[in-house]
Amino acid sequence: MCNKNEELKQYLVPGKHVHLVGIGGVSMRPLGLVLQGMGMIVTGSDMNASVSTDELIAKGIHVSIGHKAENVIGADCIIRTAAAHNDNPEIAAARSHGIPLFERAQAWGVIMQAYQNAVCISGTHGKTTATSMMTHILMEAGCDPTVMIGGYLPLLNAGHRVGEGDTIVLESCEYCDSFLNFAPTLAVILNIEADHLDYFKDLKDVEKSFRKFAELSSNGVIANGDDPHVVETLEGLEYTTFGLCIQNTVHPENISLDWRHFDVICDDEYYCHLDLKVIGKHNALNALAAVAAAWKLGVPGEAVTEGLKTFGGADRRMQYKGNFNGADVYDDYAHHPDELKATIEAVRTMKYDRIIIAFQPHTYSRTKALFDDFIRELSKADHLVLAEIYAARERNTVGISSLDLQAQIPGSVYCRTLPQVTAYLRTIAGPGDVILTVGAGDIFRAGEALLK
């Protein structure tokens, strides 16, 4: 077991030596930079050299490539990524030498206590987009925020930012109850669905985690009042609602058919007008969540309008990649049936002749647990190409393959490798089509290869 959060506070002070195992990771890299900015001596290690490790080295952080026991010598404490298990030589060395060991999420939880405003954006879907939208708003408002996003944001040329202001914004994930280590002053809940069922037992178990998260917030909760699972989860708690229905505290009026243009009403008063570049009802909801948080923080409506006007989407969220043989090619991170539903509905409004989806399921446990839901949503494609399941952190202990999906979806095609996906797409794409590479793994490579 890792030491408790309270114990970590004594180590996150100027002059202490903190070593980060897996420092090149998407949320470890900004963590290292924030700790350095707080006056700590930061070192780290990662399995491979990368753009991330190069950036850290350029900023004066010593990074060792490869995990070795000697890397932890002299450290006052160790912070590890979730991917660094107890058999990692540095973790084993820390344990044997009695060096205090902490999780990444615990460190973020301590850090955010130094900020007047700690906005933690959670939900089964939409976290990266909503956190990115919030970042655009706060940057436009001159708040100089510190930001941690689970994806790349062009505005930042990164997925993170270390600011000098009194506000920190974090994408907050429920997996392994990670967000229960946080200390939000404002908790945002976008939606709740059954997911990460390799950790949670069922939907009720997921809901329990989100309720605990909401109860952590010291200055309010903003939640989707249109989502029945959210409403059920928060029963008996006070919170501010956002959503499309007029009963919500924050809701739209005069909304366009493509969900991109509308006025926002907050507590029965006009707050701002939005002209979004991103499409779909799901993105209108993401925007309303960000607007509600900005309103609660006292951000002027004009800054919200201008901030979201420049938001063109986060990396791998309906990202336009190019055109092949007259067909537009997009990439999207959707890896849950509800996300697939939202993506397909949004693309239908774009009036293409055919929607061609190349889908790569993400993790065996999710594919098994949500099998029937995947069949229902994937069947809505005009043409479906299935890549093999992306294992991520798992081994195939449940005996499932994309071939099982293919057998249940008439007309679908199975490709064992990504080059086979690309080759097949070349044979079917034509003018008037849209090609979507979809999934949280590396399916985007199939689309990129198509455009070369």
What is the predicted role of each segment?
Residues 238, 375-431:
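C-terminal helical cap/extension that packs against the catalytic core
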Residues 420-451:
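A glycine-rich beta-strand to alpha-helix segment
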Residues 40-47, 220-225, 357-360, 382-391:
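Short internal beta-strands
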Residues 45-46, 64-67, 102-109, 148-149, ...:
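Beta-strand->loop->alpha-helix junctions that form or flank phosphate-binding loops
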Residues 3, 8-19, 27, 31-38, ...:
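Nucleotide phosphate-binding/pyrophosphate-handling subdomain across enzymes
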Residues 1-103, 107, 251-253, 279, ...:
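N-terminal leader/targeting and accessory segments in enzymes
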Residues 9-11, 31-40, 57, 71, ...:
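Phosphate-binding loop of NTP-binding sites
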